[in-house]
Amino acid sequence: MSTHQTQVVIIGGGPSGLLLSQLLHRKGISSIVLEKRTRAHVLGRIRAGVLEHGFVNLMREAGCGARMDREGEIHEGFHIAHQGQLDRIDLAKHTGGDTVMVYGQTEVTRDLYEARDAMSGVVIHEAQNVQPHALTEARPFVTWEQDGEAQRAECDFIVGADGFHGVSRKSIPSDVLKEYEKVYPFGWLGVLSETPPVSEELIYARHERGFALCSLRSRVLSRYYIQVPLTDRVEDWSDAAFWQELKRRLPDEVAAGLQTGPSIEKSIAPLRSFVAEPMRYGNLFLAGDAAHIVPP
């Protein structure tokens, strides 16, 4: 068995884990990131594309914000559609200047990978059977397998940034862990298309047929969602059926300007609200979706 020494082991190589590793490095704290998937798989995942003000500032603090600031689009407001009307909410005005930024999570992850590479950060991919140990002892450790060889990393702290289904939260004893969850009786059918967005700012639409969202990734890449029953399957929805239903849920003036096209990604996301406590057990800390999920 190969043994490694570090200050922090981070389980999960998504945005949360990579950003934490980068922030720790800038404070002189060493870390090892363990990710069970390949880098190509992580960078191929389609995820959210709107970044909150606080996260944008963290990216800058981590020294990873240059491309984000150059290519991302700042939005100072959004629209709410209801009863055929479209009302704009001035986000900057009502928050003292805070805004959101449209910049895909895939690009965030790519920027974080490049930053860790530039600083010779240790990110281990295809780490299988990851398991934290000795969480309440002074020197916890994590074991995993890579290419059939057993590995061990001893550390001061372990961070579980391995998502809702990860091993970290499950390592907290059941008599300590409390979970609060609400599963909603519907999902969001999402389509990604290489078409100009119908609006420069997001549109949240309330309609008797169900919710709809008009979002974007760039000026030539759009992301749209409609609320569907959990019993629906992706194959139940052709592109034509999706566009037709989306138009029904939008005000006429918006629907008239909607440019449709072939989907390049289509999926149904079930929605849940979830919070786990405590977020710390011994020397294990939970971060990101391992600790809490807010739909969508």
Where in the sequence are the language-model features?
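Conserved mid-domain beta->alpha element of the FAD-binding
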Residues: 11-26, 30, 112, 159, ...
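Glycine-rich, N-terminal phosphate-binding loop of Rossmann-like dinucleotide-binding domains
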Residues: 41, 162-163, 294-295
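Conserved Walker B
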Residues: 37, 164, 290-291
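Short phosphate-binding/catalytic loops that engage adenosine nucleotides
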Residues: 29, 64, 121
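Glycine-rich FAD pyrophosphate-binding loop
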Residues: 25-46
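Extreme N-terminal starter segment of soluble prokaryotic enzymes
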Residues: 4-8
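Conserved FAD-binding catalytic core of PHBH/FMO-like flavoproteins
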Residues: 114, 121-271, 275-280
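Active-site-adjacent segment of FAD-dependent monooxygenases/related oxidoreductases
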Residues: 44-48, 52-117
